[in-house]
Amino acid sequence: IDSTGIKVEGEGEWHASKHGGPKRPSPRFLEPVAKPWLDWRKIHLGIDEQTLEVRAVEVTSSDIGDAPMLPELLAQIPTDQNIASVTADGAYDTRKCHHAIAERGAHAVIPPRKNAKPWKAITAGAVARNEALRASKLLGRALWRRWSGYHRRSRVETKMHCVKLLGQRL
């Protein structure tokens, strides 16, 4: 599961917004109302790691976060189809995401946030997340990523890049 920005007009603003740098032209050249640098959408994808097939997709406005979309993406995959694991970045380290993944009987491969604290173990998602937190602290983040299979996420990032290239040309 991941998301990326798709520019509706122009280039580079998503990267500048996401990673810093100049986001817009000098204010003296702008009309007070026009904000063309904000004109982009987010595409949220659920991709099968083995086949690289896009299994779920949602397009939202730029103000929608990543984590709230995970349950909706999982809901697009038929319940009779097994999901072995869900790999996502730290933005998805939320109770709702872990709960949605556990409800589907899948294993969450989400790195705990750097300032993460254990959750009360009242749901299967919380128990699994606490185990990931414990393993991450025990092994260290780099070794945890290797041990958990998080490193395989790069295959999905490659597919995401392909989708982004296509989207910017539509």
Labelled PLM ranges:
Residues 126-170:
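Short amphipathic alpha-helical "interface-anchor" segments enriched in bulky aromatics
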Residues 1-114, 118-120, 125, 164:
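Polybasic low-complexity intrinsically disordered regions
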